[in-house]
């Protein structure tokens, strides 16, 4: 009478390594090792700089850790295995002369799916996410206020110019030229006054340089954040 023992549960936190044997298309056996693709010493994942190297005891570690463990013993460069303490000779002290763990190198060489990013869409989404709801209203108010100030300055300058012309022209240009110049100055003064009283009549698409500069600065800040 044979008794069967129940399998013991594996404690939590234990890292297991499974080996899968499959029949390849050529009729040969292909062995794939599944485990953590990281060094057992530094716990860093294997990559081009930390290539997995195989010691004589068949234990695998990254090239960086093996280079730190390299020492000279009896005029020979050697590396003690951190697990079993077996010494592996390294010809010339070159870590690259050690064999690579082909199973792990093959898994590292698997192509990863490419992720394509569109900077224009990222900037657009970030700008739309950070732009407040009253963005257009603030821009229109800034444009109207700046245009109003500019029109007032123009009106003051034209008024001063008209006073100067009225005082100087009788002594320099008598006759019809004086009245023509006075009419032109009065017309310009009237137009500037209309602009001051009715700034909404201007096209809202005409933005002043200060508003354009502020908009470009905000867009630059949004792009840098994205």
From Swiss-Prot:
Q: Where in the cell is it found?
A: Endoplasmic reticulum membrane
EC nos: 2.3.2.27
The job of this chain, per UniProt, is described as: E3 ubiquitin protein ligase that is part of an apoptotic signaling pathway activated by endoplasmic reticulum stress. Stimulates the expression of proteins specific of the unfolded protein response (UPR), ubiquitinates BNIP1 and regulates its localization to the mitochondrion and induces calcium release from the endoplasmic reticulum that ultimately leads to cell apoptosis. Plays a role in the maintenance of intestinal homeostasis and clearance of enteric pathogens.
Q: Name one GO biological process term.
A: regulation of autophagosome assembly
Q: From the UniProt record, give the pathway where this protein acts.
A: Protein modification; protein ubiquitination
Comment text on domains: The RING-type domain is required for ubiquitination.
Its UniProt entry gives the catalysed reaction(s) as:
S-ubiquitinyl-[E2 ubiquitin-conjugating enzyme]-L-cysteine + [acceptor protein]-L-lysine = [E2 ubiquitin-conjugating enzyme]-L-cysteine + N(6)-ubiquitinyl-[acceptor protein]-L-lysine
Q: Where are the zinc fingers (RING-type)?
A: 39-85
Q: One MF term from GO for this chain?
A: zinc ion binding
Q: How does it assemble?
A: Interacts with BNIP1.
Q: List the record's Gene Ontology CC terms alphabetically.
A: endoplasmic reticulum membrane
Source taxonomy:
Eukaryota, Metazoa, Chordata, Craniata, Vertebrata
Task: Report what the Swiss-Prot or TrEMBL entry states about this protein's PTMs.
Answer: Polyubiquitinated. 'Lys-29'-linked autoubiquitination leads to proteasomal degradation.
Give UniProt keywords alphabetically.
Answer: Endoplasmic reticulum, Membrane, Metal-binding, Transferase, Transmembrane, Transmembrane helix, Ubl conjugation, Zinc, Zinc-finger
The name under which this protein is listed is: E3 ubiquitin-protein ligase RNF186
Consequences of knocking out this gene: Mutant deletion mice demonstrate an increased bacterial burden in the mesenteric lymph nodes and spleen compared with WT mice. They have also a more severe phenotype in the dextran sodium sulfate-induced colitis model, which is due to a defect in autophagy in colon epithelial cells.
Q: Which residues cross the membrane?
A: 157-177, 179-199
């Amino acid at each position: 009478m044979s008794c069967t023992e129940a399998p013991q549960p594996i404690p939590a936190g234990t890292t297991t390594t499974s080996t899968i044997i499959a029949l390849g298309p050529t009729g040969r056996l292909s062995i794939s090792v599944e485990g953590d693709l990281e060094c057992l010493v530094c716990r860093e994942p294997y990559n081009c700089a930390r290539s997995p190297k195989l010691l004589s005891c068949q234990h695998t570690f990254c090239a960086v850790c093996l280079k730190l463990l390299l020492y000279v013993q009896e005029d020979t460069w050697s590396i003690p295995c951190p697990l079993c303490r077996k010494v592996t000779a390294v010809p010339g002290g070159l870590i690259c002369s050690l064999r690579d763990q082909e199973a792990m190198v093959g898994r590292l060489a698997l192509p990863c799916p490419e992720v394509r990013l569109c900077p224009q869409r990222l900037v657009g989404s970030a700008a739309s996410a950070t732009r407040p709801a009253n963005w257009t209203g603030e821009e229109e108010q800034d444009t109207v206020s700046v245009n109003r100030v500019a029109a007032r300055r123009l009106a003051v300058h034209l008024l001063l110019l008209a006073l100067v012309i009225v005082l100087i022209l009788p002594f320099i240009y008598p006759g019809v030229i004086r009245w023509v110049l006075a009419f032109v100055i009065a017309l310009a003064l009237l137009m500037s006054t209309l602009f001051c009283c009715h700034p909404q009549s201007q096209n809202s698409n005409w933005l002043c340089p200060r508003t354009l500069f502020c908009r470009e600065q905000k867009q630059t800040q949004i792009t840098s954040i994205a």
